[in-house]
Amino acid sequence: MMLEHILVLSAYLFSIGIYGLITSRNMVRALMCLELILNAVNINFVTFSDFFDSRQLKGNIFSIFVIAIAAAEAAIGSAIVSSIYRNRKSTRINQSTLLNK
């Protein structure tokens, strides 16, 4: 595949993630959009690593670290969302004002 096609795909995924993160009112949907953004960045890391220096695996290794961090972020985020749901009976972002108490 050509470099431009992969970068367009990555930009498309990143744009969908940003749009969903900005317009989302549900915490679970916001977490999913954040994962889309991280995956778009991973695609860029792997693409540029392969395009500029295919003998070294720096971009691929960095992508593995980002995937591991994203998995931890998803686990912690879903635990926080489930805790908020237990207390508030809602996962809507605008109804979660935990700092006001």
UniProtKB/Swiss-Prot annotation:
Keywords: Chloroplast, Membrane, NAD, NADP, Plastid, Plastoquinone, Quinone, Thylakoid, Translocase, Transmembrane, Transmembrane helix, Transport. It comes from the Eukaryota. It is found in: Plastid, Chloroplast thylakoid membrane. It is an enzyme of class 7 (translocase). The chain crosses the membrane at residues 2-22, 32-52, 61-81. GO terms for cellular component: chloroplast thylakoid membrane; NADH dehydrogenase complex. Gene3D superfamilies: 1.10.287.3510. GO terms for molecular function: oxidoreductase activity, acting on NAD(P)H, quinone or similar compound as acceptor; quinone binding. Its EC number is 7.1.1.-. It is a multi-pass membrane protein. It catalyses: a plastoquinone + NADH + (n+1) H(+)(in) = a plastoquinol + NAD(+) + n H(+)(out); a plastoquinone + NADPH + (n+1) H(+)(in) = a plastoquinol + NADP(+) + n H(+)(out). One of its GO terms (biological process) is ATP synthesis coupled electron transport. InterPro entries: NADH_UbQ_OxRdtase_chain4L/K, NUOK/Mnh_C1-like. NDH shuttles electrons from NAD(P)H:plastoquinone, via FMN and iron-sulfur (Fe-S) centers, to quinones in the photosynthetic chain and possibly in a chloroplast respiratory chain. The immediate electron acceptor for the enzyme in this species is believed to be plastoquinone. Couples the redox reaction to proton translocation, and thus conserves the redox energy in a proton gradient. Belongs to the complex I subunit 4L family. NDH is composed of at least 16 different subunits, 5 of which are encoded in the nucleus. This is NAD(P)H-quinone oxidoreductase subunit 4L, chloroplastic. It comes from Gossypium hirsutum (Upland cotton).
